[in-house]
């Protein structure tokens, strides 16, 4: 019985820490997005190419609706979008990707 109780306590601690980390990553992603991306992508829009927004339907249509796709785009850039791979740490880029995907899924 003690072993079962210990197992549930460990699971509870682990899942709460994962949720806190994810929330912190979204906060960090929001800060990085505001500082580096919002000039062109305020509120999920696109000031340069208006049809390629960060809204859920546009991300899906352009096959950019995954963390990997967004991370790749941010790191390497494409067309008018500059590459941020040399300017931002990988962790920061991943936080931005998580933030963008989360915001798009929740309607900005």
Curated annotation (Swiss-Prot):
Primary location: plastid
Binding site for heme c: 37, 40-41, 81
Residues in the signal sequence: 1-23
Transmembrane segments: none
PTM per Swiss-Prot/TrEMBL: Binds 1 heme c group covalently per subunit.
HAMAP family, per database record: Cytc_PetJ
Family: Belongs to the cytochrome c family. PetJ subfamily.
Known partners and oligomeric status: Monomer.
PANTHER family assigned to the protein according to its UniProt record, in alphabetical order: CYTOCHROME C6, CHLOROPLASTIC (PTHR34688:SF2)
Protein name listed in UniProt: Cytochrome c6
């Amino acid at each position: 019985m003690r072993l079962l109780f210990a197992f549930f306590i460990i699971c509870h601690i682990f899942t709460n820490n994962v949720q806190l980390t994810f929330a912190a990553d979204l906060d960090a992603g929001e800060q990085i997005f505001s500082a580096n991306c919002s000039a062109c992508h305020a509120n999920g829009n696109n000031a340069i190419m208006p049809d390629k927004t960060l809204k859920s339907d546009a991300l899906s249509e352009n096959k950019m609706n995954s963390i990997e796709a967004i991370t790749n785009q941010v790191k390497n850039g494409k067309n008018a979008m500059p590459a941020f791979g040399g300017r931002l740490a990988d962790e920061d880029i991943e936080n931005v990707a998580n933030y963008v995907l989360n915001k798009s899924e929740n309607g900005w």
